UniProtKB/Swiss-Prot annotation:
Belongs to the UPF0145 family. PANTHER family: UPF0145 PROTEIN YBJQ. InterPro entries: UPF0145_dom_sf (IPR035439), UPF0145_YbjQ-like (IPR002765). SUPFAM superfamilies: YbjQ-like (SSF117782). This is UPF0145 protein Rsph17025_2361. Gene3D superfamilies: Hypothetical protein apc22750. Chain B. It comes from Cereibacter sphaeroides (strain ATCC 17025 / ATH 2.4.3). It comes from the Bacteria. Pfam families: YbjQ_1.
Length: 103
């Protein structure tokens, strides 16, 4: 499946629009507290453990979005946007885009 932040896929024509698809992942309060407690793991001002957890959350959100697109019969997602938001000491990563079939 092609997943892109652009509104189209170069060299392909969009044949069908299937609508908006989303995926979310939430890191709970314990994960965030543990990550901040592990600040001793800083290397060059960056926390490897925190970045790893964010990466996992991002991949989960993107994977859920792709599954939603497949369920609608799409073979690509265009206009993808990733958002990060803190809600009640939890970090939510959400991915959204438009499911399409490209020729």
């Amino acid at each position: 499946m092609i997943v892109t932040t652009t509104p189209s896929v170069e060299g392909h024509q969009i044949a069908t629009y299937h609508g908006i698809v989303t995926g979310e992942a939430i890191l709970g309060a314990n994960v965030i507290r543990d990550l901040f407690a592990g600040i001793t793991d800083f290397i060059g001002g960056r926390s490897g453990a925190y970045e790893k957890e964010l990466g996992r959350a991002r991949e989960t959100a993107l994977s859920e979005m792709e599954q939603a697109a497949r369920a609608k019969g799409a073979n690509a997602v265009v206009g993808v946007d990733l958002d990060y938001e803190v809600i009640n000491n939890m970090l939510m990563v959400s991915a959204s885009g438009t499911a399409v079939t490209i020729a």
